[in-house]
């Protein structure tokens, strides 16, 4: 918990948006997830997004005081491709969850991976899905080949193809929130995906690569695309970080641990990066 609070404090004060609570937390008891959401929400001063698999209505109700949006990792809306890649999680339960979330007043979002075998004509299926479910936000990810998977020897989509999906989606939905995933190996994509219509970048390890050459490249490319980043990837604010911890309504022992984690992270972020 302390590490998550520490990261949230850094993110808030550097102007980084919190995309969503996800990952292994899906296996946590709902009350523990609620506590995590409560603390991150407290740091940011607003409700957060979550991406935790299929949520039941009773769990949505428990999380609602701290959660404003629910994301579904659809990956692809082309059903045959989806069923071949994700045989254990069909689209239907996610579809039902998104519709229920909307009825209960949540914002909704989906994630889509580009480069997994989809075709350009599948974009019309994506548009239909967005309209049917009244999606507020979409996150695109470019396939990252992972050793030991069926995509181990598949190349990531090139910049032009990845940007095409973003551009066409932006043209169809001018008011849709569009987030584009970015890996350290693909920082040269930034200018193109911002010009294509992405609002936000995600997946870049901002703390680990803070003030690195790659972080500097992202800022330069954003400027070249005539886009101003809301936060900084290269400059730490001159603030009293301990005061940021003291503001929080958490117990003294947790505060002490958060301060330790925060100090460790800030030392790493202040060191010179060569990559």
PLM region spans:
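Core AdoMet radical
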Residues: 1-5, 11-32, 36, 40-96, ...
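Alpha-helix-loop-beta-strand connector modules within alpha/beta enzyme cores
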Residues: 29-52, 73, 89-107, 153-178, ...
């Amino acid at each position: 918990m302390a590490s998550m609070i520490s990261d949230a404090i850094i993110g808030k004060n550097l102007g980084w948006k919190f995309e969503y609570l996800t990952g292994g937390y899906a296996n946590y008891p709902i009350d523990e997830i609620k506590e995590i959401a409560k603390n991150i929400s407290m740091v940011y001063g607003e409700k957060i997004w979550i991406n935790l698999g299929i949520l039941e209505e009773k769990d949505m109700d428990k999380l609602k005081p701290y959660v404003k949006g629910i994301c579904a990792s659809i990956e692809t809306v082309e059903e045959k491709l989806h069923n071949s890649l994700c045989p254990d999680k069909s689209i239907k339960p996610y579809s039902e969850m998104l519709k229920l979330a909307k009825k209960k007043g949540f914002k909704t979002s989906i994630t889509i991976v580009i480069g997994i075998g989809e075709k350009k004509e599948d974009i019309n299926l994506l548009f239909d899905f967005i309209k049917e479910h009244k999606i507020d936000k979409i996150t695109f990810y470019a396939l990252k080949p992972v050793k030991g998977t069926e995509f181990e020897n598949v190349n990531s989509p090139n910049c032009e193809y990845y940007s095409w999906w973003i551009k066409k989606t932006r043209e169809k939905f001018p008011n849709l929130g569009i987030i584009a995933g970015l890996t350290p190996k693909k920082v040269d994509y930034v200018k193109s995906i911002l010009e294509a219509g992405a609002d936000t970048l995600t997946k870049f390890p901002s703390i680990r690569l803070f003030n690195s050459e790659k972080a500097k490249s992202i800022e330069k490319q954003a400027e070249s695309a005539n886009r101003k980043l809301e936060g900084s990837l290269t400059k730490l604010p001159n603030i009293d970080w301990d005061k940021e911890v003291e503001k929080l309504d958490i117990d003294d022992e947790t505060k002490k641990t958060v301060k330790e984690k925060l100090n460790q992270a800030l030392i790493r972020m202040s060191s010179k990066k060569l990559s």
